[in-house]
């Protein structure tokens, strides 16, 4: 036996003899099985924990990861703790945890995996923190989560459903994940003075759960045609929640007019009056200047056929994932941050999202979508376009590339004012598109020859150096591009030119436009394109017979002989 072994063994015996019988030494880097983050270290915490190994559990009060004297507790009974910091470590295997009514802001740790029951009612946990905790929770089937219904988000509900857990209200009643329920949540810190008018069409069995107990009480029938919602921040999280049970085919939300304001005299024409009038059309901001955000959970309101939210309501979160029959969804003018759409097989045909705050969006599974507007937003990427789409307006976003599938039925495409560097069409010919607006992007080379039926193309305000065009285009705008030359004449005698209107203004490098055979051309704008000389203009303008053409150009750019030649061809300036 070596001297080194004997020395280590002796040291181990010395360390062991120094420990008290009541102490259990853990490694210094051992993390708690469950860690609770607290809103305040000055307030006592009362919790109830269950464990199938009660002798090995303790609450670490001093943060040394050791079971010291006074840190044991009796499982199954409430224990009150005086925390010494803003975190509380729970050690040992636990089967249930009740922290209801406590100022807990976050729960984490591998010990969540073994829980079979958890009560989180009336805590300061955000819905996001609960969702994060549930990623580890619910590994064992048949567990129970006690939580207020208004805090049960679609993600929480789906996670619990996947692991066959139950969600229980504080009063002990079960929350049916399949019950038709509409939930509206207003996120606000202060009491609001504005109201929202909610209208429901085709309603059946509608009632408003005023006291949030999950049971229909005597005065909770929903008035015919809808109701006006006041939005006081009455809940502990600073939220206002309305839970509507029943079913309806149509839902609309509008800013409710104040009856007192309607009866009052109209304000005088002044800035103060204008500001007051404006306040009637938008929800009032919080005192700190932040806007009220509305969240709509219609994921279980499966009977909906249409939903519309008025511009200015500040709707931020919408979930219609369970509304497979939904045909029209109008949310324009609201800063949508999250949107959960129905899965594949839905009936959604019209989607209006102008002014949203989304960065990415997947609409590929919306196989029946025909109209989609998401202009003036923050989209950076959009997944492939569904083939049934007819109208697409994504102007005013941050898109850098887009591919149009060859089987698309798209007729109108508006991508104005994006950041496009790449724009492609799958396949050799695309017969559907009639209008293509690519103005205000970063495109340098474009091949649009596959758009064989496109009538209007606008590629203005691009650093464009080359372009291939369809032969039967009628209107073309290439203003503010870097093109040096453009050929609009038919490529062969089998074709003829259909172009009627050309805007080639402010093209600093443009020196030649071949258009002498474009006999249908009746409007040409060359203003600001000073590199294009007068003799080239007079020689290339087509001879008009049955039409009269209009040429827009600065005075003094054409000589008298050039002017005479142009007028002789049927053109006026």
What is each of the regions a protein language model found here?
Residues 93, 113-115, 139-144, 247, ...:
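Leucine-rich repeat
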Residues 1-16:
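Sec-dependent bacterial lipoprotein signal peptides
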Residues 18-306, 311-313, 324, 519, ...:
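N-terminal capping/linker segments that flank leucine-rich repeat
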Residues 134, 292-294, 358, 399, ...:
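Extracellular beta-strand/beta-solenoid scaffold signature
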Residues 50, 110, 201, 299, ...:
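Tandem-repeat architecture and repeat-register "anchor" residues
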Residues 107, 128, 133, 296, ...:
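Canonical leucine-rich repeat
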Residues 97, 118-120, 143-150, 251, ...:
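Conserved hydrophobic beta-strand positions in leucine-rich repeat
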């Amino acid at each position: 036996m070596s001297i080194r072994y004997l020395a280590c063994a002796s040291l181990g015996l010395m360390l062991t003899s120094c420990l008290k019988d009541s102490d259990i030494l853990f490694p210094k880097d051992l993390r708690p099985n469950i860690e609770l983050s607290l809103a305040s270290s000055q307030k006592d915490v009362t919790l109830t924990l269950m464990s199938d190994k009660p002798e090995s559990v303790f609450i670490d009060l001093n943060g040394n990861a050791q079971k010291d004297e006074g840190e044991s507790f009796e499982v199954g009974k409430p224990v009150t703790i005086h925390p010494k910091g803003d975190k509380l470590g729970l050690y040992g295997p636990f089967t249930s945890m009740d922290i209801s009514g406590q100022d807990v802001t976050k729960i984490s740790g591998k010990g969540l995996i073994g829980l079979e029951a958890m009560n989180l009612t009336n805590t300061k946990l955000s819905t996001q923190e609960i969702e994060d905790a549930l990623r580890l929770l619910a590994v064992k089937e048949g567990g129970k989560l006690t939580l207020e219904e208004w805090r049960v988000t679609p993600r929480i509900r789906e996670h619990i459903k996947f692991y066959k857990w139950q969600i229980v209200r504080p009063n002990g009643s079960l929350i049916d994940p399949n019950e038709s329920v509409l939930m509206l949540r207003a996120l606000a810190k202060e009491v609001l003075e504005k109201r929202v008018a909610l209208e429901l069409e085709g309603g059946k069995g509608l009632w408003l759960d005023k006291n949030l107990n999950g049971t229909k009480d005597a005065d909770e029938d929903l008035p015919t045609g809808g109701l006006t919602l006041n939005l006081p921040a009455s809940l502990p999280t600073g939220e206002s929640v309305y839970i509507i049970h029943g079913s309806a085919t149509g839902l609309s939300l509008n800013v409710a007019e104040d009856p007192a304001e309607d009866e009052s005299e109209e304000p005088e024409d002044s800035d103060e009056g204008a500001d007051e009038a404006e306040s009637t059309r938008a929800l009032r901001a919080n005192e700190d200047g932040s806007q009220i955000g509305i969240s709509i959970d219609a994921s279980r309101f499966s009977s909906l056929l249409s939903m519309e939210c008025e511009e200015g309501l500040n709707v931020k979160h919408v979930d219609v994932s369970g509304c497979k029959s939904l045909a029209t969804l109008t949310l324009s003018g609201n800063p949508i941050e999250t949107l959960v759409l129905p899965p594949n097989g839905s009936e959604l045909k019209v989607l209006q999202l102008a002014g949203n705050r989304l960065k990415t969006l997947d609409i590929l599974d919306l196989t029946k979508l025909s109209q989609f507007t998401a202009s003036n937003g923050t989209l950076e990427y959009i997944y492939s376009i569904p083939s049934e789409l007819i109208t697409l307006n994504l102007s005013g976003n941050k898109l850098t590339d887009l591919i149009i599938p060859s089987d698309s039925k798209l007729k109108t495409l508006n991508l104005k004012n994006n950041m496009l560097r790449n724009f492609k069409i799958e396949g050799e010919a695309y017969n559907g598109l009639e209008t293509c607006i690519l103005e205000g992007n970063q495109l340098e080379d474009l091949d649009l020859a596959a758009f064989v039926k496109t009538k209007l193309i606008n590629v203005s305000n691009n650093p464009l150096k080359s372009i291939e065009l369809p032969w039967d285009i009628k209107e073309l705008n290439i203003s503010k591009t870097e093109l040096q030359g453009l050929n609009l004449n038919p490529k062969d005698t089998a074709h003829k030119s259909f172009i009627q209107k050309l805007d080639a203004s402010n093209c600093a490098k443009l020196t030649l436009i071949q258009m002498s055979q474009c006999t249908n051309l009746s409007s040409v704008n060359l203003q600001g394109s000073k590199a294009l000389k007068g003799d080239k203009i007079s020689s290339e303008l087509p001879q008009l017979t049955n039409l009269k053409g209009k040429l827009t150009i600065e005075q003094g750019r054409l000589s008298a002989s050039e002017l005479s030649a142009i007028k002789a061809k049927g053109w006026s300036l």
